[in-house]
């Protein structure tokens, strides 16, 4: 089977893929990424003492909002009726990192990979925004799709 980009027509014009004839199935996507911070920033996040408030709480809400708005940010992405979106954090004190994981679900005829990736990206950017007064050298890294299930192309695992 030949691999080809499906967001282009035969003349190379950008198109929105027609998903109208695809079966509605439950689809799940999980994405993750990390932000590396300095020790003071890590402690402020961990202890909830950042000047702007609850960094992880605000970042979680931002990530969920971003998942819901993905089709407004990515030009050829379909608007979806997301059935669930979760954002989880793992604090990694040895490496001074916060790992963010998003899980997005939909019952529909197209997947939610872009929503999961957008949720992680926005969550990480919100952490950066809320902490930049004390740490401008933070590094966002390793944003990737970890898993997707459902749909014609089958399951994908990258963990």
Swiss-Prot record:
One Pfam family named in its UniProt record: MoaC
InterPro entries hit by this protein: MoaC, MoaC_bact/euk, MoaC_sf, MoCo_biosynth_MoaA/MoaC, Mopterin_CF_biosynth-C_dom
Keyword Lipid biosynthesis listed: no
EC number, as in UniProt: 4.6.1.17
Active site: 129
One example of a Gene Ontology biological process annotation: Mo-molybdopterin cofactor biosynthetic process
Catalytically driven reaction(s): (8S)-3',8-cyclo-7,8-dihydroguanosine 5'-triphosphate = cyclic pyranopterin phosphate + diphosphate
Alphabetized UniProt keyword annotations: Lyase, Molybdenum cofactor biosynthesis
Ligand binding (substrate): 76-78, 114-115
Highest taxon in the source lineage: Bacteria
Pathway membership: Cofactor biosynthesis; molybdopterin biosynthesis
GO terms assigned for molecular function: cyclic pyranopterin monophosphate synthase activity
PANTHER family per UniProt: CYCLIC PYRANOPTERIN MONOPHOSPHATE SYNTHASE, MOLYBDOPTERIN COFACTOR SYNTHESIS PROTEIN A
Oligomer and partners: Homohexamer; trimer of dimers.
Described purpose of this protein according to its UniProt entry: Catalyzes the conversion of (8S)-3',8-cyclo-7,8-dihydroguanosine 5'-triphosphate to cyclic pyranopterin monophosphate (cPMP).
NCBIfam families: moaC, PRK09364.1
Sequence similarity: Belongs to the MoaC family.
Protein name: Cyclic pyranopterin monophosphate synthase
